Amino acid sequence: AVINTFDGVADYLIRYKRLPDNYITKSQASALGWVASKGNLAEVAPGKSIGGDVFSNREGRLPSASGRTWREADINYVSGFRNADRLVYSSDWLIYKTTDHYATFARIR
C-alpha cells in the first residue's frame, strides 16, 4: 500500500523510524531516469514518491539543536510534477508539515 499522506507518513516514521517503502531519494529516482523538469517520476518509478533527502533548514524556520539534522518527504504525490506539500522530520523525530513549499511550517508530531 502507498503511504503518502501527512498523518500516514508521520505515524509510520514514529513507529518504524524510517520512511515507508514507497519513498526513494532524489539520487535513487535519478538513477531510474527521473528528471525533475520533466515531471516523469510516475513513469520511471510507478508508485514511488521522493523522500529521505537532507533538508538544510537554511532559513532557520525549524528549531535547531546540537546534532539535529532534518530530512524531507513529498506528500500527496500521485503523478506529474511534484507539489508543494512536504513533511520535514528531524533526527530526534520532530515532524513538521508545509503545504507552501517551505514558506511556513506546522508541527504535527
UniProtKB/Swiss-Prot annotation:
**Pfam families, sorted:** Ribonuclease
Q: Name one GO molecular function term.
A: RNA endonuclease activity
Annotated Gene Ontology cellular components are: extracellular region
Q: Where in the cell is it found?
A: Secreted
Q: What is its main location?
A: secreted
InterPro entries according to UniProt: Barnase, N1-like, Ribonuclease/ribotoxin
Which residues act catalytically here?
72 (proton acceptor), 101 (proton donor)
Please indicate if the UniProt record lists Nucleotidyltransferase as a keyword. Answer: no
Q: What is its EC number?
A: 3.1.27.-
Keywords for the protein's UniProt record, in alphabetical order: Endonuclease, Hydrolase, Nuclease, Secreted
Q: Does the record bear Nuclease in its keywords? A: yes
Q: What does this protein do?
A: Hydrolyzes phosphodiester bonds in RNA, poly- and oligoribonucleotides resulting in 3'-nucleoside monophosphates via 2',3'-cyclophosphate intermediates.
Homology family: Belongs to the ribonuclease N1/T1 family.
Q: What name appears for this protein in its UniProt entry?
A: Ribonuclease
Look up and give the organism this protein is from: Heyndrickxia coagulans (Weizmannia coagulans)
State the organism's lineage: Bacteria, Bacillati, Bacillota, Bacilli, Bacillales
